[in-house]
Amino acid sequence: MSDFKAILAKLADGKSLSRDEAVAAFDHLMSGEATPSQIGGALMAMRVRGETVDEITGAVSTMRAKMLRVTAPDDAVDVVGTGGDGSGSVNVSTCAAFIVAGAGVPVAKHGNRAMSSKSGAADVLASLGVNIELTPEQVGACIAKAGIGFMFAPAHHPAIRHVGPTRKELGTRTIFNLLGPLSNPAGVKRQMIGVFAKHWVEPVAQVLKNLGATAAWVVHGSDGLDEITLTGPTYVTELANGVTRSFTVTPEDGGLATVANADLRGGDATANAAALAAVLNGVKNDYRDVALLNAGAALVVAGKAHDLKEGVALGIKSLDSGAAADKLAQLVAVSRA
């Protein structure tokens, strides 16, 4: 791409790319034709200046154009965190996904192996017996039959492999940490996204609005968690009816208590899988409560609950009735069929 030098020169001068320039730039970066120097230079220039809403919107458009799609119902939701919050916590959004599915909302969960924690969504689900190496058609069948399916990011975003080695060598967060959660292969229009820093809450909601999302909550816990936290307030930007608004929520808004020193420490995939299964099977602890808060918000985004308190109440019903645990059993069975 001869124009790429012009794009790099623009980035080197500290200038921002337009949405169309970002589409073209990321098309080149993910084409297999970009050199490691070009990839590293572009990613670091954006990172140092701070990526803009237009750049992220353009990059996501390119990611979505190149991804292998999954068929899912129009009302499907995703509950996902960017990761990279450095907390090494249990898998909150993965647990919340089963609670949401148990409440009757189809879930198209997008995720990957661990980035900064010891165990990502893919690691935990594999440890629970879910077959994560599925074709897009098989994932679609999981969503249709079990009400929940897991899309393993590398299988649906093959173009990402071209930037993988450079990202690893850079060893720092780049725009790609934000692109994954925004590039759900099932094209869900309703999302609950946790981000690793407060300053990303509003811009990510704006990107979702630009790309035609119906409803979303983008959240960041005041303790640094890329989820709604149990330890204090959480910053939220909500997208509803084409309008974004920002506010904070506390556990009390969901009918739960703030726990100053919530024990959400995670271990390896086996330990985190056991902790997740325990919550689905009725154990009451901090992990259950934080999963309920996040599931409650996802149920608001799904249009199933009017507010966080009602969402949490529906989540409790999903757990206590055994419906959430049934969803895990069904996903294991269908994914291995």
UniProtKB/Swiss-Prot annotation:
Explain the purpose of this protein.
Answer: Catalyzes the transfer of the phosphoribosyl group of 5-phosphorylribose-1-pyrophosphate (PRPP) to anthranilate to yield N-(5'-phosphoribosyl)-anthranilate (PRA).
Which HAMAP family does this chain map to?
TrpD
Protein name (record) = Anthranilate phosphoribosyltransferase
Specify whether rRNA-binding is a keyword of the entry.
no
Q: How is the cofactor bound?
A: Binds 2 magnesium ions per monomer.
Residue numbers binding Mg(2+) 1:
S93, E227
Q: What is its EC number?
A: 2.4.2.18
Q: Which GO terms describe its cellular component?
A: cytosol
Share an example GO biological-process annotation for this protein.
L-tryptophan biosynthetic process
Q: What's this protein's family per the entry?
A: Belongs to the anthranilate phosphoribosyltransferase family.
